[in-house]
Amino acid sequence: MSQPRLDELLGTLTHELRSPLVTIVSAAQLIANERDMKPSVRRALAVMERQSRQALRIIDDLFDTCAGTEGKLSLRKEVIGLADIVAAATETASHLLASRQHRLTVSLPPGPVFLEGDLLRLVQVLTNLLSNAAKFTDPGGHIRLTARVEAGQVVLRVRDDGRGIDPDLLPRVFDLFHQLPGPAAQKTGGLGIGLALVKSLVELHGGSVSARSDGPGTGAEFVVRLPVRADGSC
């Protein structure tokens, strides 16, 4: 199947799958508002809603990745503070980090730094990288998020002390549907969409993303480079 045909098929599938899932989430919320309900039924509804929302996030990520690859994903450009992006992303990822007992260290440059881009999409980029680091790091790990301004670019680094990546596999980590081999990677779940979406969104912002690792057991680092606002302010 040709790539354009595959992209069209994926776009159709995501649309067809999303509609019934939205209905399931809405129905679960509506039923959960009923007062006279057994605790076991309420718990089952909560699980149903949570799993449906998780599936929706996967579908939305897939749709956005396909749209970005085709140049059909629009961005809402505005002036954004780097600190706002980091704060929103760390808050979004906080539940996953806490559930795995990870320690997160954040280091930002002194003074305000501004970018021009889509706030929600840039938060999504950083959240995906933090979530990826959390999933591939054993419980109780240390994840570092650092931001610097270098040569007119904002450089964001997400470093973990997790399972690491075979250097031979690094060129493919951003490929759509690519998953690292081995049982340890399979335990994390996912479909290999998150990093592909990161690459697509970063490139739409005129930036680049790369990954490095010295091999299994050495952790991994993902580096995002984005243009800083020319005057450095809003």
What are these regions (language model features)?
Residues 1-30:
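Primarily the dimerization/phosphotransfer
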Residues 50-55:
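Short alpha-helical segment of the dimerization/phosphotransfer core of two-component systems
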Residues 70-75, 114-117:
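Conserved micro-motifs of the catalytic ATP-binding
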Residues 76-81, 98, 103-113:
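Conserved catalytic submotifs in the C-terminal HATPase_c
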Residues 165-179:
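Short conserved segment of the HATPase_c
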